[in-house]
Amino acid sequence: MAATTTILSSAAPTPLTAPPRARARAPAARRRRLRARDILGAALGLANGGASAALAAPLSYEETLRLSTDSGGGGGGGGEFALPDLGLGGVLDFVAQNPLVAAAGVAAVALPLVLAQVLGGASKPYGVVSAAAAYRALVEEPGAQLVDIRPPGDARQSGAPDLREAKKKAAAVPYDGEDKNGFLKKLSLRFKDPENTTLVILDKFDGNSELVAELVTANGYKAAFAVKDGAEGRRGWLSSSLPWTAPKKGFSLSDLIGDGTDGLPVTLGLAAATGLGILAYTEIETVLQFLGSAAIVQLVASKLIYAEDRKRTLKQIDDFFNKKVAPKELVDEIKEISQALLPSTGTKSQPAITEAAPATAEAAPAAATATAAPPAAPVEETSTEAAPAEPTPLSPYTNYPDLKPPSSPSPLAPAEATKNESESESAATESAPAVNSAPVAEAAPEAAPPAAPRPLSPYPNYPDLKPPSSPSPSAP
């Protein structure tokens, strides 16, 4: 009858109640015959042992032997295998004798770690790839796009990747760590479908490429990968001998506009203004004709819509064509010349005024007797538009009948001279008409009686035609 033993797992094991029974060592051939269940059990045992090593208390050598004895007695058949000794030689002998068991144990321990690394790395949509892998992805994947985050100066000096094989073009969007929102906005303008776009981030070196890859994937892009060592690194794009476009030495419109959209409106506005200026300079006549036509259309539209404006506009057009544009007839031209050179027809012609006599008291009657010649009939003013104005004659003879002026009067007797003096005084009290005054056109005056002949010599005004003698100075 087998003795019953009690195993206690503790740091200080208790003494055994019965000494262990010596067990014969199984032959080597028997130990090598392993079953599938024994291998699986050993692998699971190693895995569980490794997982719960921190929780289980250490067992002594005697306890390990008792456990192996119990498992061997309970199996009751061949196929069991003996655990190696805890020494280094025993472990090596066990691995050499049981390679499948050792491999299964290592696989059971390493497989969870490998799966965790693989699955954990695949779950992240961003990472770092080599330049060759990045170029291969750009060529093979339709949704892969290259984003060049280098500063504009570096891109102009060094060049850019050549993606003609992939029928794509690198999007130059410089990255500024202080303006992440602006960077994302520029990317959104370049790529309209971020959920299906995989970005390959290229920097000058490793600088900010991985940070940008994480940033863009966190903002809705499918995936992003940073090129290891960037464009100019030791294992970067240039060092991998991938297609590269050398910088352009001449003027390039794409460099002026840039790949971004910030400078596009200003540049296109300047180009449009320059083109319009050149066109206006070369086609100034056509431009003026166009502007004149536009002004005429505006005038017609604003002046002929309403009835009142239409009447007023038509009158202005008629006056313009009749007075300023239409050719004048010869009579109208002569009329304008006569109006400019000759005095107005409304003024009355007056006969020539004789020189006044010496300023003396007796000279007044002589001045009073000087009467005007019969005035010509006043001519009513007529409209200059109705009939052409008659030219004013420069000769005074036209004012007399048959162009004959009155003859010079003969000297009168003293009695008649006194009578004429009284008549001249009475006539002087009346208001004499102003010289060269305009005639009144209300009504034609009655025909005045013919005036007495006016003597041309002052001597008839003195008795016996003798003027008074000058006073002689008195004696002192």
Swiss-Prot record:
* DNA-binding listed as a keyword: no
Its keywords, alphabetically, are: Chloroplast, Membrane, Plastid, Thylakoid, Transit peptide, Transmembrane, Transmembrane helix
Instruction: Give the Low complexity compositional bias ranges.
Output: 11-21, 351-389, 425-446
Cell location: Plastid, Chloroplast thylakoid membrane
- Give the main localization category: plastid
Annotated CDD domains: RHOD
Q: What Gene3D superfamilies is this protein classified in?
A: Rhodanese-like domain
How does the record classify its membrane topology? Multi-pass membrane protein
For bias type Pro residues, the affected ranges are 403-412, 447-476
This entry carries the following GO cellular component terms, namely: chloroplast thylakoid membrane protein complex
Task: Show the transit peptide stretch.
Answer: 1-21, 22-58
Q: Does the keyword Iron apply?
A: no
The residue ranges crossing the membrane are 100-120, 264-284, 287-307
PROSITE patterns, per database record: RHODANESE_3 (PS50206)
Which residue numbers delimit the Rhodanese domain? Answer: 140-246
Question: Region Disordered: which residues?
Answer: 1-29, 342-476
The record describes its quaternary structure and partners as: Component of high molecular weight thylakoid LFNRs-containing protein complexes containing LIR1, LFNR1, LFNR2, TIC62 and TROL proteins.
Q: What does this protein do?
A: Rhodanese domain-containing protein required for anchoring ferredoxin--NADP reductase to the thylakoid membranes and sustaining efficient linear electron flow (LEF).
The protein's name is: Protein THYLAKOID RHODANESE-LIKE, chloroplastic
Organism in which the protein naturally occurs: Oryza sativa subsp. indica
